[in-house]
Amino acid sequence: MKFITVAAALFASTSLAVPTNPNHGGSACVPNPHHGGSSTKSGPGGNPTGGNPTGSNTNTGPGGNPTGSNTSSSPGTRTTGGSTSSNPGPKPTSSNTRSGPATTTTGTKTGSNTSSGPATTSTGNPGPGGEFHCPRGLYSNLQCCATDVLGVVDLDCASPPTTPTSGDNFNAICAAVGKQAKCCVLPVAGQAALCQNPIGGNPPGGNPPGGNPPGGNPPGGNPPGGNPPGGPVCPSGLYSNAQCCATDVLGVADLNCDTPSKTPTSGADFTAICAASGQQAKCCVIPVAGQALLCENPTGGNPPGGNPPGGNPPGGNPPGGNPPGGNPPGGNPPGGNPTSSAPGSNPTNPPGGPVCPPGLYSNAQCCAVDVLGLADLDCDTPSQTPTSSADFRSICAADGQAAKCCVIPVAGQALLCQDPLGGNPPGGNPPGSSNPPGGSNPPGGSNPPGGSNPPGGNPPGGNPPGGNHVCPSGLYSNAQCCDVNVLGVANLNCAPPSTKPTSGKNFESICAAIGKGSMCCVVPLLGQAILCQRAII
């Protein structure tokens, strides 16, 4: 009787042991394409709950040592590798079973989830010989990206040089060129917007999602227009200005842009003219010398991304009432008269002395945050007038900031959005208060950018356009519901409210109903940044 009691105790201690599986010890957030699922028995006679099919591993007889990745054990069996389970009680009825005396078995999980034991197969993420895919839909484009901003914006992106066969292979391909593997919305050469990490290994739900193969059709379909009414290369309306641009940021802000050296006669000719100078053909909102904002691909051919964001150019006329190519908000057309008065002083005498170049980037600013060398945030006018570049740098450094020469001397923002009227936005005073950002006088001098009046006409705080009472008149007059806010600066995925707001609270509730935030914007489209360059050394 004692012998039976001791044997029963030994049997219980052996069958209830749960071994540690080194192959499944990582974080669930880290893609691991080697593991396509696990076969874990939940009770007597149960079927596996993971991704591997039942009956995939078969043992040949008592005492055998299977080498497959998934093993099951009857009472008295302990396993030390692979995916394991223990089933005290009746023998399961599936083919993943064996019976026999207490035995120790070992197994090794292979990269392709195919074990070496007899009659063993399993399925999971694509292995060697297959192709790795990003999820179907919006994030279907495989990209290797150099810079990730807050997990929202990925820059300096390109397609992988070879087709990945798995999540780990995708990571390795990108890591070899010093980049990160991403699944992106826009397959734009040199950059991509709205990226997420690629799915590999055991994504939520077990099975790897399908998707479009690399180099497939970009989202959006056909290019805008066909024969645009405004000319042969750019559509009429907001995006009517043909420009050759060197740098594309997010498919939205195009930098280092110039007017084509000659008038293009077609979309192909436009592309060729710009390519001759190492630039890209773009149709832009504001043709500012040295840079341009809010560009799209020209008419003709299949540009990356297809249609411009949101389909037709929003609004028709830009903020301020004048159409593109005419007078921009504030009076003189940007870049039209390079000797016109710049914010703060004459461009031939940059503000504060010889510290910033004349023209567009003439505003000396001390900035706290630099994003990718493009967007400078939390900026203020230097506490005293710099006398030299070294003095400029030291003045800013004393406040823990960096010396910058900026286009728009606006404190602490880049997309040019502000909170709507009504309530107290972060920072205390609501938009449209008597003092502009940065103090009693706007940065750059006693007059705001563009001359004595702020861009767009009346200063914020006047009567809102159309009497909607949610956004100030002038520069920030466009009510928008925006999805993503980056640093309180860049607002992405914006659209006009579905109904006309009657108050600030109503505006907020309209946007909140679709999971967005209420904003008052300069340009009712995706966002761009302040556009700063380094001070003259």
Swiss-Prot record:
One of its GO terms (cellular component) is extracellular region. Residues 63-199 are annotated as: Hydrophobin 1. Residues 1-17 form the signal peptide. Residues 300-421 are annotated as: Hydrophobin 3. It is found in: Secreted, Cell wall; Secreted. Residues 200-299 are annotated as: Hydrophobin 2. The keyword Heme does not apply. Glycans are attached at N70, N113. PROSITE patterns: PROKAR_LIPOPROTEIN. Keywords: Cell wall, Disulfide bond, Glycoprotein, Repeat, Secreted, Signal. Residues 422-537 are annotated as: Hydrophobin 4. It holds the Pfam family Hydrophobin_2. SUPFAM superfamilies: Hydrophobin II, HfbII (SSF101751). Disulfide bonds join C134-C183, C144-C174, C145-C157, C184-C195, C234-C283, C244-C274, C245-C257, C284-C295, C356-C405, C366-C396, C367-C379, C406-C417, C471-C520, C481-C511, C482-C494, C521-C532. The keyword Secreted applies. Its main location: secreted. Gene3D superfamilies: Hydrophobin (3.20.120.10). CDD domains: hydrophobin_II. Homotetramer. Further self-assembles to form highly ordered films at water-air interfaces through intermolecular interactions. Contains four hydrophobin units with the same cysteine pattern CX9-CCX11-CX16-CX8-CCX10-C, which is a little different from HYD1 and HYD2, but corresponds to the consensus defined for the fungal class II hydrophobins. Aerial growth, conidiation, and dispersal of filamentous fungi in the environment rely upon a capability of their secreting small amphipathic proteins called hydrophobins (HPBs) with low sequence identity. Class I can self-assemble into an outermost layer of rodlet bundles on aerial cell surfaces, conferring cellular hydrophobicity that supports fungal growth, development and dispersal; whereas Class II form highly ordered films at water-air interfaces through intermolecular interactions but contribute nothing to the rodlet structure. This is Quadr-hydrophobin. The lineage of its organism: Eukaryota, Fungi, Dikarya, Ascomycota, Pezizomycotina.
